[in-house]
UniProtKB/Swiss-Prot annotation:
PROSITE patterns recorded: RUVC
Localization (cell): Cytoplasm
Domain of life: Bacteria
Name assigned to this protein: Crossover junction endodeoxyribonuclease RuvC
Binding residue positions for Mg(2+) 1: 7, 141
Gene name of the record: ruvC
Length: 193
């Protein structure tokens, strides 16, 4: 399975591509940063990011696209640009019928290091170790994109979009999801919802 990970950003959008083989064996394929010029207008910046993402998707033909979930940041302009870039990645994948998954930074840290509060350097070292890289992936956006792809390989059920979730779950994950749904329904009945 080829997984394309995206660390969304309006100035720098990290893209990492890995292959998940049998027995969770992960292999490095590609890492890059799609850039836009902060001096140009917003629409042209978005177009540059979109075109770069489309080029990567068409070049590597991933089976899944995994995107870092946008969360609130103090700088409103930063979160807006990040959300727009994430939307472009979702659009580019959806137009090609590729399943999209969203993973939080905490999920990614937990899947890769076992610690949801791992420092960036710990993440970079583990990404390099997992993928057998001799050097740490740089810049940080590139390392984060690889981390998101690895997270999806290790935790494929993470917030899949477009109703594709069930086909990517293991039997145990399906049973857990069904039990969780039943428990939620029972709680809803007890609360009179």
């Amino acid at each position: 399975m080829i997984i394309l990970g995206v660390d969304p950003g309006l100035t720098r959008c990290g893209v990492g591509v890995i292959e998940a083989g049998a027995y969770r064996r992960l292999s490095f394929i590609h890492v890059d940063v799609v850039r836009s010029d902060p001096k140009t207008s917003q629409d042209l910046r978005l177009l540059a990011i979109y075109n770069g993402l489309v080029e990567k998707i068409e070049r590597f033909a991933p089976d899944a696209v995994s995107i870092e979930r946008v969360f609130a940041q103090e700088n409103r302009n930063t979160v807006l640009g990040t959300a727009q870039a994430a939307g472009l990645a979702m659009l580019a994948a959806a137009q090609r019928g590729i399943p999209v998954a969203l993973h939080t930074p905490t999920e990614s840290k937990l899947a890769i290091t076992g610690n949801g509060k791992a420092e960036k350097i710990q993440m970079e070292r583990m990404v390099a170790r997992i993928l057998g890289l001799n050097t740490l992936p740089k810049p940080a956006d590139a390392a984060d994109a690889l981390a998101i792809a690895i997270c999806h390989a290790l935790r494929p059920a993470g917030a899949l979009q477009g109703g594709e979730r069930e086909q990517h779950l293991t039997a145990a994950q399906r049973q857990w999801a069904q039990a969780s749904q039943k428990a939620a329904r029972r709680q809803g009945v007890r609360r009179g919802m």
